[in-house]
Amino acid sequence: MTGAPFATRLRRRDLLIGTIVTLASPEVTEILSTSGLDWLFIDGEHAPIDFLAAQTLLATARVPCLVRVPEATEAMVKKALDIGAAGVIVPMVNSAQQARAVVSFCKYPPRGVRGVGRVRAQGYGFDFARYMASANDETVVVVQCEHIAAVEAIDAIVAVEGVDAVLVGPYDLSGSMGLLGQVEHPDVLAAIARVAEACGKAGRALGIFTAEAAKMKPFIAQGYTLVAVGVDVAALGDAARATVGTLRG
């Protein structure tokens, strides 16, 4: 990987195109990371990917990877960073207090409470000095806005120093509004627009997931830069179905 660090590109709001990884397959991760994507979203929340499997994926990836942890706890965040993730995506961050805690988990003292171990992130100790000198600045902190409570608190959340980006979760957000799955409902779109407005004013990068590239284009036009399009299992299934359809059509 060459050029500016991933954290720098994210903070200056370059367009960063990624996809979600749910398969604990290093081959899939390697293939995806050589396809022109800027980053990979390793899903440790919904997918059956534990930290050992995630570390294997990180070892084969050729682009920066953000690991979504199962929950916003110090232990989960620490493990994700220790195995070598470029940063974390933390679900259900619904208040500034939660956001401050997440940032603290990601930063070494005196900026936070992250513990130190001899781990993959710093070359098992052999790259300790370099990693420790840069980790606080280069570790990416992404909080998810996927509940109406987070929308209501979004101005305070984006004001938290150390929050690099807000990733909107449309499906869970719609569910919290009593509109599960209705991601294009006017009320859901208005809530998402509220988040976008707050991020724009605060200078925070803004991210979102869509299942299809065509549905992502309008969001990019609106200023979304940390974008995740599709899921590995969907790409695999779609390709197989297309092949069968072509041959039997």
Predicted regions and their residues:
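Expand to "…catalyze enediolate/carbanion chemistry for C-C bond making/breaking, isomerization
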Residues: 1-249
